[in-house]
Amino acid sequence: MSGIVEQTAVPSRVATVSLHTSPLDQPGTGDAGGMNVYVVEVARRMAERGVAVDVFTRATRADLPPVVELAPGVNVRHVPAGPYGRLDKNTLAEHLCPFIFGMLRAEAQNEPDHYDLVHGHYWLSGQAGVVAARRWGVPLVQSMHTMARVKNASLADGDEPEPEARLRGEDQLVRQADRLIANTDDEARQLREHYGARDGQISVIPPGVDLEVFSPGSRRDALARIGLPAGTELLLFVGRVQRLKAPDVLIRAAAALLERDPSLRSRLVVGVVGGLSGGGMREPGLLTDLARSLGVADVVRIEPPQTRERLADYYRAAAVTVVPSYSESFGLVAVESQACGTPVLAARVGGLTTAVADGVSGVLVRGHNPDDYAAELHRMIAEPAWRAKLAMAAPEHAATLGWSRTVDELLDVYRACTAPRALPLAACR
């Protein structure tokens, strides 16, 4: 009987590693995005189920306290590593050693066996996680979120390929992780094909959406709350402004749409909600200059990142949310939009093929030709019955992707990897 109890025991404390971006950061700014949301939502719900979570992240300011309580049972631990300030993500590998030292030093202040498991997010965190997990004698669970070989295979024009150090680091990480978490079946396939991961090493667990915050509501009221008149056709982009996310595709598509139907200009708004990020689109005026050159500056509205509650209003106000990314391991924005009852027009890439039910809750487009996006946008505006059909199905599709399911399935993985401690770590594979 004791063996059965050990096999099903829930770990008491998990060390989560989010080196390059803090869960306290506002999503949509810098390197903060869907991964930040994932770490926060999972940590909160793990704590509600009795699993304490410490999130280790790099300190970006000297005045940050060593520990900040994010929620009951969830602490964010700021680790000094390299100079303060926002650093280019590609330079952070140079500061792995002090970061790892800081993690080990923090753990050494506790009783032995303080952590039952390490969960790394992104390859940099995984590098630190490998060392910490082996030092503490606990399993390493790794979520890649994005992968270098996948990104390099679908670069936007002008984007730079991921560095060789990341390629080698990801190869090493896949070999050493006890369990890999893939967001979708497509990501699991990529882990096998590009990195040689074994089937039994991978667990496919889709991320979720907060269905209490992101829920349907009156479009007219939402338009008023964000300062737009009733009848506005809002084409919405949400995310970091970087080439990978391709906000320029939406602006070019809007120009093609207005060329096709000039009568739309008086009620069309292209909303870009998000902050500047890495990936080659750092010039503050790049999108506004593009809009001006295409003659659509009068309909383009660029807004900073919003709180979750405010963002939900943007989704509700939109006629359609456009996600034209070149690569996505999942596509949280697409799911949030659908949860609010707004259909999605997205690129047929990566996790977006799971996040969007093509022809049911949205439409997937092959490639990144603005004319193809313009054609689909025109249909959604010109055929309200078609858009209404998609909008009605969107919340139903999003409801299958709640965070409770994500955390339940992650807990199953954690249990398998932590019990019994006497077994080899490879047993959780």
UniProtKB/Swiss-Prot annotation:
Positions with a binding annotation for Mg(2+): Y315, R316, A318, T342
Enzyme class name: transferase
A GO molecular function held by the record: D-inositol-3-phosphate glycosyltransferase activity
InterPro entries, A to Z: Glyco_trans_1, Glyco_trans_4-like_N, Glycosyltransferase_grp1, Mycothiol_biosynthesis_MshA
Annotated catalysed reactions: 1D-myo-inositol 3-phosphate + UDP-N-acetyl-alpha-D-glucosamine = 1D-myo-inositol 2-acetamido-2-deoxy-alpha-D-glucopyranoside 3-phosphate + UDP + H(+)
Residues involved in UDP-N-acetyl-alpha-D-glucosamine binding: Q26, P27, G34, R240, K245, Q306, E328, E336
EC number: 2.4.1.250
Function: Catalyzes the transfer of a N-acetyl-glucosamine moiety to 1D-myo-inositol 3-phosphate to produce 1D-myo-inositol 2-acetamido-2-deoxy-glucopyranoside 3-phosphate in the mycothiol biosynthesis pathway.
Family assignment from sequence similarity: Belongs to the glycosyltransferase group 1 family. MshA subfamily.
Protein name: D-inositol 3-phosphate glycosyltransferase
Origin species: Nocardiopsis dassonvillei (strain ATCC 23218 / DSM 43111 / CIP 107115 / JCM 7437 / KCTC 9190 / NBRC 14626 / NCTC 10488 / NRRL B-5397 / IMRU 509) (Actinomadura dassonvillei)
